[in-house]
């Protein structure tokens, strides 16, 4: 998860920079809504985590089906969600330039590369473990789910 998000952020930052250099408007589609278990994050935090300059005043997002009624079922909640989305995008755009000038990016990048490396190594060790399949079979309804006639 750490490495995937770090690599995605680096790719978006590179594409944003190249777009600026070449005069090409780059637009990203951020599918970050929904439950945390499916990769989602609270709206404000997900937008704040995007690379500086990657929004440029426009933002497109998805909402997973299970959260649509939760967020938009009544007028008050819907107003709050739209305000949160709009203010988060505005904040990201306004702070992107200022923060890029203030943050010693190379130190952050070096730290994230190290964290990402440790994360990737741990993930690969888990995936390559000879005991992983047995653990998953014993701790989840995997075999029962396979028998369901859906």
What are these language model-derived features?
Residues 2-12, 24, 32, 43, ...:
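Acidic, glycine-enriched catalytic cores built around paired aspartates
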Residues 46-67:
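Acidic, His- and aromatic-enriched active-site or binding-groove loops in soluble protein domains
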Residues 1-7, 16, 20, 26-52:
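Aromatic- and carboxylate-enriched substrate-binding clefts and catalytic-loop regions
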